[in-house]
Structures are given as C-alpha cells and as structure tokens.
Amino acid sequence: MTFEDDLQASVRTIPDYPKPGVMFRDITTLLGDARAFRRAVDQLVHPWAGSKIDKVAGIEARGFILGGAVAHQVSAGFVPIRKKGKLPHQTVRMAYALEYGTDEMEMHVDAIARGERVILVDDLIATGGTAEGAVKLLRQIGADVVAACFIIDLPDLGGAAKLRAMDVPVRTLMAFEGH
C-alpha cells in the first residue's frame, strides 16, 4: 500500500452530503488518527524543511487545524484567514467566488509584514475560489506566497490548476477523482 493509499484510507467519504450527488471527503477521521495526522503534516511541510518560512496562513476552519500544525513544524507564526466579521482588530478584506455567488474573507492588517514568506494551508482544494481569494488577500498586503498546501485535491474541479496559473506552487497529498 502506498503512502497516498494509506492516507486515503484514513479519510471518510460521505455520499450525498451536503446535497445529492456530492461525495463529501471528511478529514476528521484523519485528524483523529495520530499516525495519519502526523504523517500528513510531515508530508505537507517536507518540501520546505530547512527553508525560511515566516508565516503559515490557514483558511477557516479546517485550515486552522492543519495550519497550526504546519506552522509548528516549520517554526513559523500562524495567521488565521477568517470569514468577514470574525476578527476584532483592523482587517484587510477580499471578496471571493462561491459556487453560487460571492463571500468575503479577512485577516488582521498587521498579521503579515510586506515581503514575509507565507505558506497557505487548507484541508481540500476543489474549485479554488476560496484559495484564490486567500492568495489575492495575502498578496494585497505584500506577502510572498511560497506555496499552497492541501491534504486533498479534487482535480476534476480545477482549483489546483487555478492557483498554479497564479504562479503559486501547490502541494497536495491525495486526489479523489470526481466530486
């Protein structure tokens, strides 16, 4: 069994959630398995071992869990990227595309200094709308987005390709065809 097969076995798939026809990939089972969680975090950060990374930005909500662990591994600070209205201090905001409409995300305006090297982290990349918005938000405040990391890629939906087209290297640990 390969690393990817082993990791995929730790992800629960729930058919027809949140709506009919969707195969929901639930990483809470991976997070609850200490060995799988550790291996996933180690593999996410492997390309940057020994590199200077200043901050890890995690997208709400599962990106907070993974981002905190990744930040610890690379000895970097952690920055939450949240839905609009959830942060108490002055923020910078970016609109992003959803399947049906738009939403906004934000981060504290002073969370990242211009030129800091940042890795963006979330659990899954599908269409890439949220991750694209996060990259734009980070670049708006002057961050150098070194990479975007995800446990799961749904390649048929094109999100990873969208980020690569923005000159952001993308690291994923497993792919599920279809959605």
From Swiss-Prot:
Pfam families: Pribosyltran. Pathway: Purine metabolism; AMP biosynthesis via salvage pathway; AMP from adenine: step 1/1. It is found in: Cytoplasm. Its EC number is 2.4.2.7. One of its GO terms (molecular function) is adenine phosphoribosyltransferase activity. GO terms for cellular component: cytoplasm. It catalyses: AMP + diphosphate = 5-phospho-alpha-D-ribose 1-diphosphate + adenine. It comes from the Bacteria. CDD domains: PRTases_typeI. Keywords: Cytoplasm, Glycosyltransferase, Purine salvage, Transferase. Its main location: cytoplasm. GO terms for biological process: adenine salvage; AMP salvage; purine ribonucleoside salvage. Disulfide bonds: none annotated. Catalyzes a salvage reaction resulting in the formation of AMP, that is energically less costly than de novo synthesis. Belongs to the purine/pyrimidine phosphoribosyltransferase family. HAMAP family: Aden_phosphoribosyltr (MF_00004). NCBIfam families: apt, PRK02304.1-3, PRK02304.1-5. Homodimer. This is Adenine phosphoribosyltransferase.
